[in-house]
Amino acid sequence: MKTLSLILLLLSLSANSSDLSAPQVAIQKYFEYFNAKDIDSLNNASGQPFTLINGGRIIKWNKYGDSVDFGGLESSGWAYSRIHQNELVYEDDMTAMVNINFSRYDSADAVISTSDVIYLLVYRDGAWKLKSGFVNGNLTLGK
């Protein structure tokens, strides 16, 4: 029975991911890179400069990797993040906006925080790149 449940879950996840637009898939990949703490892949998946509007403050970094401190996140208890909602707001040939609701979890799978972020993506060099994030509330990147 457990095997059947696992197979159905995997099929469900596979079916859901195939329904996503290319910008939504780009955001999923970004979360995979973030969870892997892969700064190089995060930089490659984002436009330069990267801006974040967070708690009413506008912050700009040359590269996404300059914005995040995984050591600081881990010291706050962060172990990984998980997307709950991935909604395409807008897409044209050059830009897209994706509305994300996600949670950060600790190593015991307890929710640390839940946030809503709208990401702006740009289409450059044949790929969707994360350019800006608009946070509804306050979201730490470990700094």
Positions of PLM-derived features:
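Beta-strand elements of well-folded, non-transmembrane domains
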Residues: 35, 104-106, 123
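Sec-dependent N-terminal signal peptides
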Residues: 3-14
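A short gly/proline-enriched turn/hairpin at secondary-structure junctions
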Residues: 46-61, 76
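Short, low-complexity N-terminal intrinsically disordered segments enriched in polar/charged residues
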Residues: 12-39, 44
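A mature extracytoplasmic/lumenal domain signature
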Residues: 46, 56-57, 100-104, 119, ...
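Short beta-strand edge/turn micro-motifs at domain boundaries
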Residues: 114-143
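Hydrophobic pocket/interface hotspot
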Residues: 30, 42, 50, 98, ...
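Surface-exposed, charged secondary-structure patches
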Residues: 67-110
